[in-house]
Amino acid sequence: MKKIIKGLLLISVICLLCACRNNKNTESKITLDSNGFLTKEAIKNIQTEDDYIILDVRTKEEYVEKHIVDSILIPYDEISAKTINIDKNKIILVYCRSGRRASTAVEKLKDLGYTAYNMGGIDNINLPKE
């Protein structure tokens, strides 16, 4: 009986250590700068490891002028449960011109149950644009 209890205790400790290690990896790849924007390293980490989309929350005119390759456009004032048809398992990386509208959009998305992060302004994001 003592061997069974010791074995179960050992398995529990191993599971706990693995769970803590995975949590640290997730936390370490999501880092924000002093403005609350994702760091360049965090964006790179998310892109290589996770299922994500890039969301542009500027106006249609701004999007047509210049946008990040493969981003989708949903103006920040149009974000609602009715207009968003994005898988809730995806991480949403949000940007605008300066980061202000993206901040509002991130809060709306979080309220709707999404995992979303503010990338900041388009000119400060080191990703291909078209």
Region roles according to the model:
Residues 95-96:
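Short, surface-exposed ligand- or partner-binding patches at beta-edge/loop junctions that are enriched
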